[in-house]
Amino acid sequence: MIPRDQRGPLQAGPAIIPRKPDRDAPPAIQPQAPALQAPQGGFITTTPNQAVAVSRTKATDRYQFWWNYYRTHEESSADLKEKVTLLNVNRKFQDVHAVLLGYLTHYAKTHSEPWMYEALALAIEMNKGDDKSVRLALKYAADKAEASHNPNALVSVADMLLLHGYDYETAGKLIDEASMKVPHREVPLLLSILLARNTKDPKRMAEAVDRLLSLGWPGGDEQIRSHARKQVEQLAKALHEEGRAAEAETLLAHLTESESRDVFIRLTWLGDAGFGLAVDEPLGATARFQTPRTVFGGAVVKEGLGNDRESVYVCPRSFDGDYTIRVDCIYNNEAKPALEATLEIITHEGTPREHKETRIIPLGRTIAPVVVHLTGGRRKEVLPFVAPPTPVTVPVATKPKSNKEKGSRPSPRAANASEPSSAGRGEVKARPR
């Protein structure tokens, strides 16, 4: 399965009409029972156990209600999403469809967003609607996503198109724009790999895999690399079966080149201890467990704790210069301590220039740093920088003295002592290096 970084789809399943009254059901327009006509004498004649015929409303009534509701009520996107979510949780799938149709009928040009058409497509499916309507809803979703240029919307709609097997050309456009806007995220690249697999496009596959493997992925690097290799091999096999052997061999050759890494560093040890790597990169950034990836392409993809006694740093596409490796001690059990560690350093891994070096690092109170110099690095540009939240220092509020104690009228600042001072508000601490 391909990991996804968007919300999950609405629950699917047949609509269920509860037998008991549902207190959470939305208001509905119910027709009145037909009035009984009184005879000329002014009396109403009845028959014992007479059943009064009342025509029951059908599903069309809920559509009429929400159409009328949104004709006179304006609602924010957040409120609509909350309403749709609650209806879906309560398995009121026809109401989900009716709400979205009513809203989009009146606000499609002014308030509509891509997710609304995605939800509409799912609602049509849940209510066993026709495939043509689902396709149309996703077409509108794609148009909205493309107009928004929001990478989350682009990825979400592209994922829906691939899931349904619709309009691969449009899905490709959405994926390509998203991957350019967020090159540090894996989901657009994984979707591009899936699209290449479905369309048997070796060029797209090679480009997506190369971009994916040009970075380290903290917490899942080996799984992502394994997935990419598997997808390439399966596409190459399919190409061979279609008589496209030359394209298959070219694709496999590209994979070998993409899997190579400029810098690979691994630290291992024996004993009850935990150690992390901190690598100072040539242009000034530091990769460590707290900030695992830098804008220069390096990443701490694994930190050893407990029985997993291994920490790994990779920089598949690196800038030239000195890489200073420091070992941070997280803990070291005095009863079963780790006394030394093995540091494995590989440059130009998987190429004819590959160089391996192994060092034994004594794990004393002070651990000397190790410097590795790289030449021939393949990185040409930095990744986009996303600033972390700004730390704010708020001074501790002190209780102001009373007027009697001070002997004078309190100043406005003393009267509002709980408000942070202008010096404290917005104070920015230096980023650790």
Locations of the language-model features?
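Alpha-solenoid helical repeat scaffolds
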Residues: 81-82, 114-119, 151-157, 186-192, ...
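Short coil turns that delineate tetratricopeptide repeat
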Residues: 74-75, 108-111, 145-149, 182-183, ...
